[in-house]
Amino acid sequence: MALLAVRMLVLGLCVGGQAAAAGEGQSTPATCSPLCRCDEDGGADCSGRGLTSVPTGLSAFTYYLDISMNNITELPANVFRNLPYLEELRLAGNDLAFIHPEALSGLHQLKVLMLQNNQLKTVPSAALKNLNALQSLRLDANHITSVPEDSFEGLQQLRHLWLDDNSLTEVPISPLQHQSNLQALTLALNRITHIPDNAFANLSSLVVLHLHNNRIQEIGKNCFNGLDNLETLDLNFNNLKIFPEAIQMLPKLKELGFHSNNIASIPEGAFCRNSLLRTIHLFDNPLSFVGTTAFQNLSDLHSLMLRGASMMQDFPSLTGTINLESLTLTGTKIRSIPADLCEDLTVLRTVDLSYNDIEDLPSFQGCVRLQDINLQHNQIKQIDRGTFQGMTSLRVLDLSRNQIKFIHRDAFLSLSALTNLDLSLNSLASVPTAGLSALNQLKLTGNMELRNGLMSKTLPKLRSITVPYAYQCCAFVAYDSAVNPAEDDERRNAFGGEEDMERIPMVMHCSPLPGAFKPCEHLLGSWMIRLTVWFICLVALLFNCLVLAATFSPRTSSLSPSRFLVALLASANLLTGVYVAALTLLDTVTWGSFAEYGVWWETGAGCQVVGFLAVFSSEWAVLLLALAAVERCLAVRALMGKAGALRSRGERRERRRRFAIAALLLGLVSVAAACLSLYHGSAMGSPLCLPFSEGSSPGLGFTVALVLMNTLAYLLSAVVYTRLYCRLGRAQLADPEQAGSVRHIAWLIFTNCIFFCPVAAFSFAPLLAGTSNAVGGPEMAKSVTLIFFPLSACLNPVLYVCFSPSFRYDWLHLRGRGRTGGCGRLVAKTVTKGTVAGGSPVSDDGEGLSSDCGMYTKLHGDSRGMCEHCDAALHIRTSSSSGSSSSSACRHLVKSHSCPALMGNVPQCLSSEGYWPDTGTLSAQSEYGDEGDSFVSDSSEQVQACGRACFCQSRGLPLVHYSYNIPRMTD
């Protein structure tokens, strides 16, 4: 007190002197070093200035000096001799490695000394001896390995001592034996492995003891002897294997932590002598046993946290722990909760029982103050009516990641204060909303059985909701955009007028949001897209059925490999048309309210069947087109003499069989791809039932694989046809039949590739950041998918019907314009030989010229049938382009007789030697008709003669015969 009075007197004199000087027009500035910032109260801040020594020129009345975060490496003797009134000295964050024994001499008023974050290797005991007023000493974050016995001699006023974050290997027992006034001791973050008995025997005033983050494996039973006033004990993050029974010698202990150790069991009555405990942290220990009575009768316990006791099976008894407010028991194998839990814990506010094996819930009716319940990741299967009855204070309820299948419709009836409800990742088929008038946030993600929508009007205060399906957001988005005016007035009145209501956020957040692939009203979107899809559907169904009917008609000739592939391609395209028809029908049935049926459609068998058909048909069509390209290449090479023409009927059949097997194998590949789309669920999650949808999904890899396979198929077709065109010369392509077939397949490949590119681009879009936004977003992706995906199935049969002479011949037979018979078969074979995918007739294997003279002889008796077959050939001639040619057989029949019906009983036309009987010339052996034998070179008189002959024959008039060479019909 005397020193304080002297100091106040000196300060008063200084102030009076300064005032007198000011009265005379002069000023006396306060003494301060130019390297520091000083204040009027005697504080000097010299931190972070890069100083290498203690600054000079400071006022003698400085009581606070901060020279931390500099580069001072040592303190010389008497460096602070001019600062007798210094009370707080901060030297942290320097590189101090040496402190002279006399460096701190003269600092008799020093109370706080901070030496942390330096390079000290031992406690500077000599320099600390004369600091009799020191109350707080920080030596943490150094490299201290030892503490001399006389380190703290003379520091009788010391209250707080920090020795943490050093390299101590043992508790400094001797240096601490005289610190009876010490209240807080920190020895954390060292290398201490053992605490012996009576280690803190003389620290009777100690209140806080931190020993965390050491390597303590063993604690003596009497190590805490003498700590009669200890309230906080921290033993976290050590290697303890046995429960520290020494804590029973701490009668005033209030906060205990020994989490993150290796303690395996907590004995019965473990805390029976620690009745004042308020908080216990026991988590992250491999507990296999917890005594039932371990936590009984802890009347002051407010928080109990036990986490990670993976072997714990029984719920601990909490009898007598009447003031518990927070209970955390997670990561155990507890299967049930005591029915009388709320009878003992009436003031409980927070319960966390997550990550256990709880199957049944008792009634929480007695826990009237409970505000937060966390029961996620358990085995709960149902919520009964009385489980949460009477819990009017409950605000947060987490029941996620359970197996809940049923919730009673009145289970939430009394939860008038509930604002957050998490029911995600369960198996709920319905969610009751009665009583949830105050709910702000609702999570229902992962309840895939929840297909029905929620009524937004039953949740008036809901602001955030997550649902399993985007369609269920349609009700909330629409509700938010069109609020009922009456309800709007009620809200405005409740919040006290428009100004107050404007401050309240009224935005509804619903996830996942509906969009182009999750429409709320119409599946097909705009009318332009809808009309286009309808047109594609009708054309695909009509023309593919027409191609199949004409190709497989019993009136037509036998199928060549090319026509067989045409039929299979039409079948695949027809299935695609069926897929589009299903979408158009669904759009019509769910007109304006697709959200009500979207979930049922996506998750039902109908979408799976339609998706299977779509993937199978599209993949098979792509692969068949590649096979058709290969077949055309082989056929043309054979005709050009590259591989030799097939002569025998057996070889022709073998060739047809090989292509049929190849088509079947490709069909099996397509079936496998369609099945994989169902297995991976890539066709799910979109009402289009296709593996092409917006955003990334688990099936994105499968989608990419499909696109790559289709790309390879188109690339193969393009390479095959490019090589074919390069090898064929202008003279060889001059044959109109050959050129027509090759050109037609080329057009098919070109158009199908063009239609495939947009679909493939949008399939890869999710892999490229920002692509969907750049090209128009999901709306554009959906439009492209709806139009370009089935467009090839629409155009392929149209090309075949409009540009294939083979189809015209089949169509005439389908209409009954032709009859079966030798010349009929001859005309059919010659017209359709080598037809592929709507190509012009090109002889692929020579089967078109397989009729012999015997066949003619049999047909000569039926002059009317021969005339009708010739008439069919003439119709083909007149309906074909000028560049195409008709059957060479009927061509020569017309030359010979003007009409085959006029031949009468002409004898066998061919001799055994292969010469024509009328001329004796060698019969033709080539499989190609010469240009002189085409209908283009025939005179119109011959054509008219055939017509006149047919007219005369029908009326029994005389006939006129002409004699021309008839070519030999080869096998």
Curated annotation (Swiss-Prot):
UniProt keyword Cell division present: no
Segments forming domain LRRNT: 27-60
Predominant localisation class: membrane
Signal peptide positions on this chain: 1-21
Knockout-associated phenotype: Morpholino knockdown results in disorganization of the olfactory bulbs with a significant reduction of GnRH neuronal development compared with uninjected embryos.
Annotated protein name in UniProt: Leucine-rich repeat-containing G-protein coupled receptor 4
Biological process annotations from GO: bone mineralization; bone remodeling; G protein-coupled receptor signaling pathway; hypothalamus gonadotrophin-releasing hormone neuron development; negative regulation of cytokine production; negative regulation of toll-like receptor signaling pathway; osteoblast differentiation; positive regulation of canonical Wnt signaling pathway
Extracellular membrane side: 22-531, 585-608, 680-699, 766-782
Function in brief: Receptor for R-spondins that potentiates the canonical Wnt signaling pathway and is involved in the formation of various organs. Upon binding to R-spondins (RSPO1, RSPO2, RSPO3 or RSPO4), associates with phosphorylated LRP6 and frizzled receptors that are activated by extracellular Wnt receptors, triggering the canonical Wnt signaling pathway to increase expression of target genes. In contrast to classical G-protein coupled receptors, does not activate heterotrimeric G-proteins to transduce the signal.
GO terms, molecular function: protein-hormone receptor activity; transmembrane signaling receptor activity
Origin organism lineage: Eukaryota, Metazoa, Chordata, Craniata, Vertebrata
Localisation: Cell membrane
Organism expressing this protein natively: Danio rerio
Transmembrane segments: 532-552, 564-584, 609-629, 659-679, 700-720, 745-765, 783-803
InterPro entries named among the record's database cross-references: GPCR_Rhodpsn (IPR000276), GPCR_Rhodpsn_7TM (IPR017452), Gphrmn_rcpt_fam (IPR002131), Leu-rich_rpt (IPR001611), Leu-rich_rpt_typical-subtyp (IPR003591), LRR_dom_sf (IPR032675)
Keywords of the record: Biological rhythms, Cell membrane, Developmental protein, Differentiation, Disulfide bond, G-protein coupled receptor, Glycoprotein, Leucine-rich repeat, Membrane, Receptor, Repeat, Signal, Transducer, Transmembrane, Transmembrane helix, Wnt signaling pathway
Family: Belongs to the G-protein coupled receptor 1 family.
CDD domains assigned to the protein according to its UniProt record, in alphabetical order: 7tmA_LGR4
Membrane topology: Multi-pass membrane protein
Domain of life of the native organism: Eukaryota
